[in-house]
Curated annotation (Swiss-Prot):
The protein, known as: Peptidyl-tRNA hydrolase
GO BP field: protein quality control for misfolded or incompletely synthesized proteins; rescue of stalled ribosome
CDD domains (UniProt xref): PTH
Organism phylogeny: Bacteria, Pseudomonadati, Pseudomonadota, Gammaproteobacteria, Legionellales
Positions marked as site (Stabilizes the basic form of H active site to accept a proton): 94
Residue stretches in coiled coil: none
Active site: 21 (proton acceptor)
Amino acid sequence: MAIKLIVGLRNPGSAYEQTRHNAGAWLVTALAQRHNSHFKIDKKMQAELTEIDINNHPCRLVLPLSFMNHSGQTTRIISQFYKIEPGEILIVHDELDLPVGRIKLKTGGGHGGHNGLRDITAQLGTGVFHRLRIGIGHPGHKDLVHQYVLSRPSMHDRQQIYDAIDRGIAIIPIVLSGDMARAMNQVNA
């Protein structure tokens, strides 16, 4: 099934823009920039939206205006309005359980403690959507997670995350064509 909607999870606002938790939005923003596409605020959809077309595969790019933990409502509103099935959605998000700079494509699964994914699963009524997980590493103890994800990465970690984003963007044409197995083989290797 071809992907028709890519959502970059984030917390909106300049205070959060450069934090680890916004790695998903970094990728979606970079993808739009590489295709000379510009986001526009759509208050009805509760998001910044734009559209790209790669090899005759159109896709909407979304940056929710809500905080990460409420990303599901935006995802549901947009997917219902455009009649996009959960299996046609790619959620791009930060992942504590991957080392900094790793990136993995996954279909379905649980939320793994990620509140953005938890809300999307609840709002869509299913976890059967695709995820592009950008590794941000783990602070080592669960009590440090909140502060860690809302902090800025070091320059070294930031560069590793950017490198992962480049690898993620490289598979988007394959993802949009619907060949998830090939995309997984390429990016998960």
